[in-house]
Protein backbone atom coordinates (compact mmCIF):
# COMPACT_ATOMS: atom_id res chain seq x y z
CA UNK A 1 0.00 0.00 0.00
CA UNK A 2 2.82 2.41 0.86
CA UNK A 3 4.38 1.65 -2.53
CA UNK A 4 1.13 2.62 -4.32
CA UNK A 5 0.88 5.89 -2.35
CA UNK A 6 4.49 6.68 -3.17
CA UNK A 7 3.87 5.92 -6.86
CA UNK A 8 0.82 8.21 -6.95
CA UNK A 9 2.79 10.96 -5.20
CA UNK A 10 5.52 10.60 -7.85
CA UNK A 11 2.95 10.92 -10.65
CA UNK A 12 1.55 14.02 -8.95
CA UNK A 13 5.03 15.54 -8.61
CA UNK A 14 5.74 14.80 -12.26
CA UNK A 15 2.46 16.36 -13.36
CA UNK A 16 3.02 19.47 -11.25
CA UNK A 17 6.57 19.82 -12.59
CA UNK A 18 5.29 19.48 -16.16
CA UNK A 19 2.54 22.03 -15.48
CA UNK A 20 5.07 24.42 -13.99
CA UNK A 21 7.36 24.07 -17.03
CA UNK A 22 4.53 25.00 -19.40
CA UNK A 23 3.22 27.86 -17.27
CA UNK A 24 6.63 29.38 -16.58
CA UNK A 25 7.56 30.01 -20.20
CA UNK A 26 6.29 32.66 -22.57
CA UNK A 27 6.79 30.39 -25.57
CA UNK A 28 4.36 27.69 -26.61
CA UNK A 29 6.51 24.58 -26.29
CA UNK A 30 6.13 21.17 -27.84
CA UNK A 31 6.35 18.03 -25.69
CA UNK A 32 10.05 17.53 -26.48
CA UNK A 33 10.92 20.99 -25.08
CA UNK A 34 8.85 20.31 -21.93
CA UNK A 35 10.59 16.93 -21.56
CA UNK A 36 14.05 18.55 -21.72
CA UNK A 37 13.00 21.23 -19.20
CA UNK A 38 11.52 18.70 -16.76
CA UNK A 39 14.61 16.48 -17.03
CA UNK A 40 16.62 19.31 -15.43
CA UNK A 41 14.94 18.52 -12.11
CA UNK A 42 13.64 14.99 -12.77
CA UNK A 43 16.31 13.28 -14.89
CA UNK A 44 14.49 9.92 -15.04
CA UNK A 45 11.21 11.22 -16.48
CA UNK A 46 10.40 9.69 -19.86
CA UNK A 47 9.08 11.46 -22.93
CA UNK A 48 6.03 9.16 -22.80
CA UNK A 49 5.26 10.33 -19.26
CA UNK A 50 5.48 13.94 -20.40
CA UNK A 51 3.14 13.28 -23.35
CA UNK A 52 0.59 11.49 -21.12
CA UNK A 53 0.63 14.21 -18.47
CA UNK A 54 0.38 17.01 -21.03
CA UNK A 55 -2.70 15.24 -22.40
CA UNK A 56 -4.26 14.95 -18.94
CA UNK A 57 -3.49 18.60 -18.14
CA UNK A 58 -5.03 19.74 -21.44
CA UNK A 59 -8.11 17.53 -21.00
CA UNK A 60 -8.65 19.02 -17.54
CA UNK A 61 -8.26 22.63 -18.73
CA UNK A 62 -5.06 23.30 -16.78
CA UNK A 63 -3.23 24.10 -20.05
CA UNK A 64 -4.26 24.51 -23.68
CA UNK A 65 -3.12 22.30 -26.55
CA UNK A 66 -2.66 24.21 -29.80
CA UNK A 67 -2.52 22.32 -33.10
CA UNK A 68 -0.54 24.11 -35.79
CA UNK A 69 1.27 22.91 -38.88
CA UNK A 70 0.84 19.27 -37.79
CA UNK A 71 2.40 19.77 -34.36
CA UNK A 72 0.94 20.19 -30.88
CA UNK A 73 2.16 23.13 -28.81
CA UNK A 74 1.13 23.80 -25.22
CA UNK A 75 0.03 27.07 -23.63
CA UNK A 76 -0.03 27.70 -19.90
CA UNK A 77 -2.33 30.70 -20.29
CA UNK A 78 -5.87 29.35 -20.15
CA UNK A 79 -7.72 32.68 -20.26
CA UNK A 80 -9.29 33.56 -23.61
CA UNK A 81 -6.70 35.13 -25.91
CA UNK A 82 -5.53 35.01 -29.50
CA UNK A 83 -2.34 33.73 -31.09
CA UNK A 84 -0.09 34.83 -33.92
CA UNK A 85 2.03 32.19 -35.66
CA UNK A 86 5.08 33.37 -37.58
CA UNK A 87 5.44 31.18 -40.65
CA UNK A 88 9.11 32.18 -41.01
CA UNK A 89 10.52 31.38 -37.55
CA UNK A 90 7.62 29.15 -36.38
CA UNK A 91 7.17 31.10 -33.15
CA UNK A 92 3.72 31.40 -31.56
CA UNK A 93 2.98 34.73 -29.89
CA UNK A 94 0.16 35.53 -27.46
CA UNK A 95 -1.99 38.42 -28.63
CA UNK A 96 -3.54 40.02 -25.58
CA UNK A 97 -6.22 42.19 -27.10
CA UNK A 98 -9.73 42.18 -25.74
CA UNK A 99 -11.98 40.17 -28.00
CA UNK A 100 -15.11 40.94 -25.99
CA UNK A 101 -16.39 43.31 -28.68
CA UNK A 102 -15.85 40.73 -31.42
CA UNK A 103 -17.45 37.95 -29.36
CA UNK A 104 -20.35 40.21 -28.43
CA UNK A 105 -20.98 41.12 -32.09
CA UNK A 106 -20.91 37.46 -33.15
CA UNK A 107 -23.33 36.55 -30.33
CA UNK A 108 -25.70 39.36 -31.33
CA UNK A 109 -25.62 38.42 -35.00
CA UNK A 110 -25.92 34.65 -34.59
CA UNK A 111 -27.81 34.44 -31.28
CA UNK A 112 -25.24 31.83 -30.18
CA UNK A 113 -23.66 31.92 -26.72
CA UNK A 114 -19.87 31.85 -27.09
CA UNK A 115 -17.94 30.24 -24.25
CA UNK A 116 -14.56 30.01 -25.94
CA UNK A 117 -12.86 31.84 -28.79
CA UNK A 118 -9.88 30.28 -30.57
CA UNK A 119 -8.17 32.68 -32.95
CA UNK A 120 -4.91 31.84 -34.72
CA UNK A 121 -3.45 34.43 -37.06
CA UNK A 122 -0.55 33.59 -39.37
CA UNK A 123 2.01 35.84 -40.97
CA UNK A 124 5.56 37.13 -40.60
CA UNK A 125 6.58 38.54 -37.21
CA UNK A 126 8.31 41.90 -36.85
CA UNK A 127 11.70 40.33 -36.12
CA UNK A 128 11.60 38.10 -39.21
CA UNK A 129 10.54 41.02 -41.37
CA UNK A 130 13.74 42.82 -40.44
CA UNK A 131 16.19 39.94 -39.93
CA UNK A 132 14.99 37.12 -42.19
CA UNK A 133 15.83 34.61 -39.44
CA UNK A 134 14.59 31.07 -38.75
CA UNK A 135 15.12 30.77 -35.02
CA UNK A 136 12.31 30.17 -32.61
CA UNK A 137 12.34 30.42 -28.87
CA UNK A 138 11.18 26.85 -28.16
Which residues does each predicted region cover?
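Short coil turns linking two alpha-helices in DNA-binding domains
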Residues: 46-47
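Non-DNA-binding regulatory cores of transcription-related proteins
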Residues: 62-64, 68-138
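Basic amphipathic alpha-helical segments that dock to polyanions
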Residues: 50-60
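Short alpha-helical segments that sit at the start of domains
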Residues: 1-20
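Short amphipathic alpha-helical elements of helix-turn-helix/winged-helix folds
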Residues: 20-25, 37
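DNA-recognition alpha helix
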Residues: 30-43
Amino acid sequence: MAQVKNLMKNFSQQRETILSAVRNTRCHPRAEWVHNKVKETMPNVSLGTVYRNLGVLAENGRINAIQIEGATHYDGVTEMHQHFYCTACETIYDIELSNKTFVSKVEQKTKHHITESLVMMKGICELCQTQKTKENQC
